[in-house]
A protein has these predicted regions:
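Single conserved hydrophobic/aromatic residue that forms the stacking wall/gate
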Residues: 1-7, 11
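Long, hydrophobic/aromatic-enriched structural stretches that serve as scaffold segments
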Residues: 4, 17-19, 268
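A short glycine-leucine-enriched loop at secondary-structure breakpoints
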Residues: 6, 136, 178-180
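Extended Lys/Arg-rich, glycine-bearing segments that form polyanion-binding/interaction patches
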Residues: 12-136, 250
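Flexible, glycine/charged-enriched surface loops at secondary-structure junctions
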Residues: 29-31, 47-55, 140-143, 193-204, ...
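Short beta-strand scaffold segments in enzyme catalytic cores
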Residues: 80, 140-141, 158-161
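Conserved catalytic-core subdomain
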Residues: 87, 91, 99, 146, ...
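Zinc-dependent deaminase catalytic domain
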Residues: 131-144, 150-153
Length: 277
């Protein structure tokens, strides 16, 4: 995304390269990728919004263009970048959401495409999302596809938990998307002195932490929302409320810090932003 005021971009090519490799699609050279995005953003400069929380959303994608039937690797592809101005994700403040722990459907399994940014992952998540909405929940907390036991992602976002002062998030083992926001927040958290555990957390341990009060905060992480606080988890006949259904202090601080870097209000000591001249 980019802001008009600073004309800076937060972009990442490595994830697309890995996604393309898994799908037997050609990779886009990093220099070409970055220059293409910069050229498009420069051309669309008048469409970059300047109000707080707004941005020009940048979406690169690739699809096959070979005119043929059958299941095989295509001979030709098209690489496209589109942009759209978007309003503030939290126009009325950052409000926690109610999450359904999904124990019927699964999002991904090892050896599949769970770590890629491909349409099939989103298609397989729709049934769970519809089920959650019917139960009065906003999103789905996905469990692993083998044991149906370990938490992985929430909706289309990575998720983090603050339990007894430490941070927990699912490891990158082929079923979880290696989110750019996830990676950014891990860097920030460790710089702040937090212990970040990239490890398997069972839903039973999550619910137990909720009941005994050690589950202090929970939040999804992603490009559009940056962070999305969780106020309640519903699992089978049980439920736990997180932080009295209020956004946590750490969640708010992470949001303010990362958006501050993106908007050029805070120093970018990590080199995450790219100026567009």
């Amino acid at each position: 995304s980019t802001s008009r005021r600073q004309r800076q971009m937060c972009i990442r090519d490595s994830r697309m390269i890995k996604s393309n490799e898994r799908l037997c699609m050609p990779g886009v050279p990093e220099e070409m990728f970055v220059e293409a995005v910069k050229a498009l953003v420069k051309a669309q400069e008048d469409w970059v919004p300047s109000e707080p929380g707004t941005s020009l959303y940048i979406r690169p994608f690739m699809f096959a263009t070979e005119a043929s039937l059958g299941v095989h690797m295509a001979k030709s592809y098209k690489f496209v970048i589109i942009t759209t101005p978007v309003g503030a994700y939290y126009a009325e403040g950052i409000n926690p959401v109610k999450i359904l722990v999904e124990d019927e459907y699964v999002r991904a399994v090892k050896g599949g495409t769970g770590f890629t940014k491909c349409g099939g992952n989103y298609a397989s998540s729709i049934a769970g999302q519809v089920k959650a909405e019917k139960m009065g929940c906003t999103q789905v907390l996905w469990l692993d596809g083998v044991h149906r036991k370990y938490v992985e992602e929430v909706g289309t976002m990575n998720i983090m938990f603050k339990i007894a002062g430490e941070i927990y998030t699912a490891p990158l083992e082929g079923t979880v998307l290696p989110g750019v926001t996830r990676d950014s927040l891990i860097h920030i958290l460790r710089d702040w002195g937090y212990k970040v555990n990239e490890t398997h957390l069972s839903v039973d341990d999550l619910m137990k932490a909720g009941h005994d009060g050690t589950l202090e905060e929970a939040f999804g992480t992603g490009t559009a929302a940056v962070v999305s606080p969780v106020g309640e988890f519903v699992y089978k006949d049980d439920s736990v409320v997180v932080n009295d259904f209020k956004i946590g202090e750490l969640t708010q601080k992470l949001y303010d810090t990362l958006t501050g870097i993106q908007w050029g209000k805070l120093e970018d000591k990590y080199g995450w932003t790219t100026p567009v001249e």
